[in-house]
Amino acid sequence: MVRKVAEQNLQKNNENDRELSKNVYLLGFTSFLNDMSSEMIMPILPMLITSVGGGSLSIGLVGGLREFISNILMVLIGYCSDKVRKRKIFVVLGYLTSSMFKLLLGLSKSWLGAVIFSSLERMGKGIRTAPRDAIISESMPKTLGKGFGIQRAFDTAGAILGSTLSLLFILYLQYSFNQIILIAAVIGFLTLIPLYFVKEKPSPSNNKITFRVGIKNLPKELKLFILISAIFTLSNFSYMFYILRAQEFLMIVDEKMAIIIPIALYILYNIFYATFSIPFGILSDKIGRKSVLTIGYIVYGIVSLGFAYFISQKSLILLFALYGIAYALFAGNQKAYVSDLSSEDIRATALGLFYTVVGLTSLPASLIAGYLWKISPEMTFLYGSVLAIISGLLLLFI
């Protein structure tokens, strides 16, 4: 009798584990749709801004504000999610908010409107990210690197399709930037379908956790890692500067190609990002997050140095490919490392704090990059290279 009950409990636990692991794929497909939508917009956003009168500082402002707004919300939403032990409602609200502001961005006709609505669109990311990542970490606790790698691979596969669609719409249908953004907004609303099937891990609300206690209870190693991540973020300014660098170089060669080729290079970046996200996540499960992150930060520094001094038509292909590899090394593994270093009851708070600190530094990062660009583009990328390599070396001391 006891054995039979034990077997039934084991079977029930296995079924629950399978249900939870499905969450990773459902959230991955949600990310696929969202990034298809977002990445139809992202490669053309810097061109949209410059076409309506914005300059490098405008690009720096929108690049910084987008990350600042999204990340500043994450610690508060993460804390609220831990407090009430609810994840899914915040995830749904986040994706819905993003889609609504994409729609308004598509109706915008000025650089100021592009800055405002593009920045507010990232509120959605700030609302959904920490609770979503907490669901992933609770669904695959023994293989976090693989879990976040799967989510990141879906995310980036959607990005490849989205930026490819953007390129095809321009090449063959001659759609305007605004038309492409409106189509992207419609796709964004489709993210709500797979979210319906996500199941939360049941757990009681934790009224004992206050915001201050949640932050105070974070381990010293985690706080140190978040500090180093902030230093790295100062080097990791907006992707738009990489597209702008390629566009300005190609303008000398062919004005028409200066629009098409940067989008194609951005697709190449996403292909390498998607291809290596899961392998590098699995690698971090085996050899440790810190080792993989150190390599990622240093590779990013080398890429930034390449954009400063080794620009040619052929080198742009190599540099955008390495840019994708660098992101595959550090993007998902940063979140996995934060999850490793935090307990389950404060995990969303820890992830939220990580994103918020990163967000606070992303605004000055892109503004500094925009200011340095006015001196020379080389200065922007040299600054990024030095800080990234320093960050990689600092990880060795955790």
Swiss-Prot record:
One cellular component term from this protein's GO annotations in UniProt: plasma membrane
Subcellular location: Cell membrane
Transmembrane domains' residue ranges: 43-65, 89-108, 156-173, 180-198, 224-246, 259-281, 291-311, 316-338, 351-373, 380-397
Stored InterPro entries: MFS (IPR011701), MFS_dom (IPR020846), MFS_trans_sf (IPR036259)
GO molecular function: transmembrane transporter activity
Keyword Translocase: no
PROSITE patterns xref list: MFS (PS50850)
Entry membrane topology: Multi-pass membrane protein
Protein's UniProt keywords contain Transmembrane helix: yes
Keywords associated with the record: Cell membrane, Membrane, Transmembrane, Transmembrane helix, Transport
Gene3D superfamilies in the record: MFS general substrate transporter like domains
Origin superkingdom: Archaea
Disulfide bonds: none
Family: Belongs to the major facilitator superfamily.
UniProt-recorded name of the protein: Uncharacterized MFS-type transporter MJ1317
